């Protein structure tokens, strides 16, 4: 069972939608304005790419809110997600489960390769199916939030008429945009790009994409590694497991970084491509 196939009552869906709207409000008016800026640009390859970028931004915004909405539904319907790890042994709670042990026992775990379930409270590798899906929802929301910021930076790159290159919403690229526009809007965008919060979010996304994913207790045991260095000192590699509240906070923060950047970006686009009456 996936969270979106569960039979939630209309009352529950309305309540969770209200909670989503409160915590992750839709930037509807800015999305409409951004679309109108590029909708009637004369036909050209650049205009076509701009319109596709803006359509991507629109759809990704809805996708992020969908994932965060599903996460809220899971926290509401599966309270074990919020309580995960409370009853753990102190050693497991403090350090995690040795990764070597998890890998050695992998072949002996009952139904270890099962990925489809009809009960979200089913145990799975030390967590629950609901917790496993919950973490995936947050990871997907974070991934999309960084992706939509990169597309937003590309739209602004076209507006600045800068030579095309690989564009990302990072401080180096946004500095070039600020040099081109030298505006209050790009100064705001630069503060976002240079901020500790966005860089933390990007580091999380990069770990997920390229190196080591984060773990949460709700989705299973956190892997523990330890060894001795060249000086004989014990080294313990143990990343603290994320709890559900902090994971949702990460997803929400990622989304709100995008919506904060969207407002000044739309202002820039309205000046570059005035909305036609």
Segments predicted by a language model, with ranges:
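Extracellular acidic loop/turn motifs
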Residues: 151
């Amino acid at each position: 069972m996936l969270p979106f196939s569960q039979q939630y009552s209309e009352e529950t869906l309305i309540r969770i939608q209200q909670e989503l709207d409160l915590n992750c409000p839709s930037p509807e008016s800015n999305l409409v304005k951004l679309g109108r800026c590029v909708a009637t640009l004369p036909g050209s390859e650049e205009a076509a790419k701009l319109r596709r970028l803006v359509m991507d931004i629109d759809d990704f915004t809805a996708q992020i809110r969908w994932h965060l909405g599903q996460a809220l539904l899971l926290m509401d319907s599966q309270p074990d997600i919020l309580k995960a790890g409370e009853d753990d042994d102190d050693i497991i709670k403090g350090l995690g489960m040795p990764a070597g042990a998890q890998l050695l026992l992998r072949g002996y775990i009952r139904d270890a390769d099962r990925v489809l379930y009809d009960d979200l409270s089913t145990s799975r590798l030390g967590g629950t199916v609901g917790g496993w899906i919950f973490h995936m929802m947050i990871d997907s929301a974070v991934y999309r939030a960084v992706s939509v910021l990169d597309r937003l930076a590309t739209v602004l790159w076209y507006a600045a008429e800068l030579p095309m290159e690989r564009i990302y919403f990072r401080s180096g690229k946004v500095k070039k945009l600020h040099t081109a526009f030298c505006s209050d809007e790009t100064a705001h965008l630069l503060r976002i790009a240079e901020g500790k919060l966005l860089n933390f979010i990007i580091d999380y996304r990069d770990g997920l994409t390229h190196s080591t994913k984060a773990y949460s207790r709700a989705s299973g045991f956190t892997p523990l590694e330890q060894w001795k260095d060249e000086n004989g000192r014990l080294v313990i590699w143990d990343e603290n497991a994320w709890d559900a509240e902090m994971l949702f906070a990460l997803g929400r923060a990622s989304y709100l970084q995008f919506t904060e950047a969207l407002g000044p970006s739309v202002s820039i686009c309205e000046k570059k491509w005035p909305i036609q009456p």
